[in-house]
């Protein structure tokens, strides 16, 4: 299973990361830094549907999405279009991401930034804060019975978080824990197939006072209008923007249709 491979390799990578920079070192650095914290949760609480635009070079299911990948250029484009937050892939092996992307994008983009990675260790939460992330992704399928502990740690660190769920059991767990932002992934992490109706199916297990983010398989303005019509608060769009990032006119038309009709 792809997810198992990613998690295994992430744990191996963390062994090296901790040798290079220990948790104590990170905590010490955090105590001496005045970090620019942006309110990710607030960006998703608008009357109209909010859009989180993603920056990623590759994915396990699609391979390299953009050969001419330039995170700074993409960050500048995202600064000047009608989106509400930015998601940045930092996973190295499968998505070809880097921690450094958050810092360099934050220099050219004023919107809240989500660190998109596979969190398996609390070390990564402290690391996320150090590298300038405003929010992190917590994947229920990865954390399982550790989800509540990790969610509480994000609160202590002043980080927002999206708790990602893929099935009824995970949706109920995230709701019971009290997770304020719940991401429903329309992609099945077992085989990476997608079905946008997954969001509607799982929403009924999430209390109405939570922020719901729909992730994956969102390709058209009509997809966004459909999701808004069923009560979704925000959508995360990655590949669709990455493949069309040079067509600024097309992206603006996409966003106008998605938001102006909402």
From Swiss-Prot:
Keywords: Amino-acid biosynthesis, Aromatic amino acid biosynthesis, Decarboxylase, Lyase, Tryptophan biosynthesis. Pathway: Amino-acid biosynthesis; L-tryptophan biosynthesis; L-tryptophan from chorismate: step 4/5. It catalyses: 1-(2-carboxyphenylamino)-1-deoxy-D-ribulose 5-phosphate + H(+) = (1S,2R)-1-C-(indol-3-yl)glycerol 3-phosphate + CO2 + H2O. Coiled coil: none annotated. GO terms for biological process: L-tryptophan biosynthetic process. It comes from the Bacteria. Signal peptide: none annotated. InterPro entries: Aldolase_TIM, Indole-3-glycerol_P_synth, Indole-3-glycerol_P_synth_dom, Indole-3-GlycerolPSynthase_CS, RibuloseP-bd_barrel. One of its GO terms (molecular function) is phosphoribosylanthranilate isomerase activity. Its EC number is 4.1.1.48. NCBIfam families: PRK00278.2-4. PANTHER family: INDOLE-3-GLYCEROL-PHOSPHATE SYNTHASE, TRYPTOPHAN BIOSYNTHESIS PROTEIN. Belongs to the TrpC family. This is Indole-3-glycerol phosphate synthase. It comes from Clostridium acetobutylicum (strain ATCC 824 / DSM 792 / JCM 1419 / IAM 19013 / LMG 5710 / NBRC 13948 / NRRL B-527 / VKM B-1787 / 2291 / W).
